[in-house]
Amino acid sequence: MNYHILAKKWRPQTFNDVIGQQYIVSAISNSLLLGRIHHAWLFFGIRGTGKTTIARILAKSLNCKLGISPNPCRKCSNCVEVEQGNFIDLYEVDAASRTKVEDMKELLDNIRYLPSKGRFKIYLIDEVHMLSRYSFNFLLKNIEEPPQHIKFILATTNLEKIPDTILSRCLQFQLKPINLNEIVACISNILHKENITYEIKALSLISQKSEGSLRDAITLTEQMISMGKGNITEKIVRKTLGMLYEDQILYILTTLLNKDLKNLVLCFKYISDTHINFENILVEILQLLHQISIIKIIPSIKLNDTKYSKNMQHAIQKIAELSNYNDIYLYYQTALLGKKELHIAPDQKISIEMTLLRMFNLNTKPIYIK
């Protein structure tokens, strides 16, 4: 039985299927429709946002037998071969594994020859920032004035490492992190097609953990399918990722705000006795303080229903009413500092306890919340 991982199985094959990058898709589509096709394109942004996917669709659009179009037919031999990864005129390489100038010379050795089958020869170089200085120099010579039948598509997660001489010769497109709601909608659609049951709260947690990377979210979803035996629940996600429930995070925060020493000791015991990702505790506290700050300044704003339950929303509004903004900001800064120190501390448990103690002892006015 052949199994296809979800990220590959449901990879977008047309521009219309691309999630969360509408302005880039629109710009590329207009370029293709107008026939204003640049010889070098650069896509940059965090992992899992669609750089390579868009590059492959662009390669397909440029070489479709029905003509250059933002809507390739997906039926001709060129389109099919691009999707299968064996199109003879698409040279796709990972620069991380081919950093030497000799590798670049070998790749571009036949650049002067016409395409064997397609309209253009396309060089798709992923993680291009990993190339050596000499490789960049050799690439520059070819990217300055390439033959009419050559197109370069570069992708990177680290724009700062690419020489300005390369950047100045490319059309540059920044792919933004995917919106939480768009990730939830995409995962939900995939799970419906896969006949997998789920809880919407579980998908929200997965989306938050992915930090804007759709591929990370889909990969994490696949892990949760296995953990939950085909049923993705909030409980499974929280247990797997070491995440607290919202009432537990609220309990820790109100203990700090109330300056309740007895409950602080209980918090320490709970953190010690359970298998929790310590960083998640501070991340959740930071997110909660952020929401409280927003409600404090803009009371009319609507909280995210996907992330917070009605009870939690009520608690956030109550804290915002009773608190002082400067105090909340001080708690936020202290928690943020604790998060930065977490990975350099000799013991993360000690680090989280020290951060909570620091927050507990801040010179702030207690807020009594039941």
Curated annotation (Swiss-Prot):
What InterPro entries has UniProt attached to this entry?
AAA+_ATPase (IPR003593), DNA_pol3_clamp-load_cplx_C (IPR008921), DNA_pol_III_gamma-3 (IPR022754), DNA_pol_III_sug/sutau_N (IPR012763), DNA_Rep/Repair_Clamp_Loader (IPR050238), HLD_clamp_pol_III_gamma_tau (IPR045085), P-loop_NTPase (IPR027417)
The residues that hold ATP are: 45-52
The cellular component terms of Gene Ontology attached to this UniProt record, alphabetical and capped at eight, are:
DNA polymerase III complex
**What keywords would UniProt list here?**
ATP-binding, DNA replication, DNA-directed DNA polymerase, Metal-binding, Nucleotide-binding, Nucleotidyltransferase, Transferase, Zinc
**Can you list the disulfide-bonded cysteine pairs?**
none
**Cross-referenced CDD domains, in alphabetical order?**
AAA, HLD_clamp_pol_III_gamma_tau
For the biological process aspect of GO, one term held by this record is:
DNA-templated DNA replication
Coiled-coil spans are none
Pfam families in the record: DNA_pol3_delta2, DNA_pol3_gamma3, DNAX_ATPase_lid
Single annotated GO MF: DNA-directed DNA polymerase activity
Q: Supply the Gene3D superfamilies for this chain.
A: 1.10.8.60, 1.20.272.10, P-loop containing nucleotide triphosphate hydrolases
Q: Which EC number(s) are documented for this chain?
A: 2.7.7.7
- Positions bound to Zn(2+): 64, 73, 76, 79
Cited NCBIfam families: dnaX_nterm (TIGR02397), PRK14961.1 (NF011522)
Oligomer status and interactors? DNA polymerase III contains a core (composed of alpha, epsilon and theta chains) that associates with a tau subunit. This core dimerizes to form the POLIII' complex. PolIII' associates with the gamma complex (composed of gamma, delta, delta', psi and chi chains) and with the beta chain to form the complete DNA polymerase III complex.
Q: Which family does it belong to?
A: Belongs to the DnaX/STICHEL family.
Biological role stated in the UniProt entry: DNA polymerase III is a complex, multichain enzyme responsible for most of the replicative synthesis in bacteria. This DNA polymerase also exhibits 3' to 5' exonuclease activity.
Mind telling me what this protein is named?
DNA polymerase III subunit gamma
Protein's organism: Buchnera aphidicola subsp. Baizongia pistaciae (strain Bp)
